[in-house]
Amino acid sequence: MDKDCPTLYFIAGVTASGKSALAMDWAEKNNAEILSCDSIAIYQGMNIGSAKPSIHDQSRVQHYGLDLENVDKRYDISKYLKYAKGVITEAYKRKSRILVVGGSGFYLRSFFSAVVDEVVVSKDIRKSVEALYLDEGLTGLL
């Protein structure tokens, strides 16, 4: 392995599989910082559905990727990748290890394959889809 090439570490898995406890243990033993890769944890106030680390755990190990945006705002993969790149770059400057932890497959895959920066959906299309949903429900969108 190239010593000059930084390494990212990953823990991924389904909800309630023990990722958080394993991540805390590994991060403490390996002097690492944790970057959350959870598409729900990025939102402020979404604490139950995302199993965010406790304040105590956050004081033991530096965490990133939590509470980045108000729940009523749009936060997409391109914003997450820009944020994650900044966190990783700064950590490497400090010679700190980064452990990426999460169960959001789409966000995790973005570390390994290219994604579209941003998909712009016109207001006309949004209105059309919304009208279809109101008229026919979810089955109309399938």
What are these regions (language model features)?
Residues 1-142:
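Phosphate/pyrophosphate-binding catalytic cores of soluble transferases and nucleic-acid-acting enzymes
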